[in-house]
Amino acid sequence: MIDLKRNTKGEYVEATGLNSQKWRIYQPNQKKNFKISRSRFGEFKDCPRCFYLRLVKGLQSPGMPQFKLNELTDTLLKKEFDECRKIQKPHRKLIEDGLEHIVPYDAGITKIINSKKEEKEWQIIDVWRESKNHGLKYKFKDTNIILQGGIDDVWLNTKTKELIVVDYKSQASPKEVSQDTYFDKSGYHGSYKTQLDFYAYLMKGMNLEYGISNDSYLYVVNGLDVEEGFNAEIKFSETLIHHKIETDYLDHEIQNMIDTINSDKIPDSNKSCKNCAYARQRSVIDTLGDVN
């Protein structure tokens, strides 16, 4: 896609291809603490070269469109679960699926200093959700890397007293959402497993009052193509997709990511990376002209 750069006023400005926010650029072997988000870790797994060029060299890749409808469904689901959180009752979908022993986790209230240096009270679940400045945080071992991620929700298993990682997903597919097929033959659905594992890994490192469950869930809402038409409303199916948490592999992969950014050598690209393939072909044409 073509992405045109605008300033905060919505006016078109020159795109340099470089990140002007120097604090977002990592210097190999720097001593100062540096935050790496769950999405950046996902980029490392997808293509180490693109990840390195963004984080260390400061290249700014074209942006992706914001999916406002997906954001809206997330917001509405959070409102539903927050109402259940206040009274510590299971959500209607949990009751429907025979999971009455699970309730939205009430982590309490904390105080946060905002950008205006004002102290404000926040629900802790909202701190964990706010990925830009807060979120779940864990400093990786004895390094300067702070791992970070904004989670959609956390539930509590009242029987085992364990916390459950939850992420909301919105889609529109003619196929029925099913536990048996959801993770089959889909690269990006498979990446959701890593997302859940990563959140659980962070929570384990945060030493919370409860242990972290090996059970996690995707709350998938799927827009339905109904015969009667639009009529100013969209109907959704709702499905809980279960994932058994695995975090043992993350120590090695995170350390590999840190070793990569502490090296002066730019890593090889993923051979399936379309961004790298486009960059190579564009470079040839820009340098030599049309070679076909």
Predicted regions and their residues:
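Amphipathic alpha-helical segments that form well-ordered structural scaffolds
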Residues: E80-E83, F198, L202, N256
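Mg2+/Mn2+-dependent nuclease catalytic core
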Residues: E130-H252
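Metal-dependent nuclease catalytic cores that hydrolyze phosphodiester bonds in DNA/RNA
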Residues: M1-K159, L288
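Serine-centered coil/turn micro-motif
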Residues: M64, S186-G190, S272-C276
